[in-house]
Amino acid sequence: MAGKQLSTKTVVAIGIGAAVFVILGRFVSIPTGIPNTQIETSYAFLALMAVLFGPVAGALIGFIGHLIKDATTFGPWWSWIIVSGVVGLLIGFISNRLKVEEGDFGWKKITLFNAVQAGAQALGWFVIAPVLDIVIYAEPANKVFVQGIVAGISNIITVGVLGTIIIAAYAKTRSKSGSLSKETS
């Protein structure tokens, strides 16, 4: 049985999405005062791409984008790279329920989006990243849990505000299903 292949459109979206993730992560982030922890606008963009292209694209954009960003700075930090992929994956799972390409991103969908993104970020940054930091790098628990909590909270807020705004703006550019009517003479 042949596996489901990614469309050309999705593959291109992954490449462009990873590149934009890198640019935003490198040049449009705000230091928090906690070592190696910034407020990242790249996760709002990741959320948009995951919502538009689904979980596989979201996972790959987060993973590849974060990997390249780290590789061009201080070197790959695998625990956080993995979490970026997990966050993209989990947010992408709701793409079929949101259907923003149909032009509708009302309060129910905004609430669903933010519940899922907050849960994905919390799981990733409050639990997975710190545990992997301890397992992979033998980092001190108190340090990595503080970093994870700060990163998670800032990402939840950034995606909650900026992500919601850009997804809503995108949805407004799409025609609502059934919005056209036939003219009668």
Swiss-Prot record:
InterPro entries: ECF_substrate-spec-like, UPF0397. Keywords: Cell membrane, Membrane, Transmembrane, Transmembrane helix. It comes from the Bacteria. The chain crosses the membrane at residues 11-31, 44-64, 74-94, 118-138, 149-169. Disulfide bonds: none annotated. Its main location: membrane. It is found in: Cell membrane. The keyword Transmembrane helix applies. GO terms for cellular component: plasma membrane. Belongs to the UPF0397 family. This is UPF0397 protein BPUM_3679. It comes from Bacillus pumilus (strain SAFR-032).
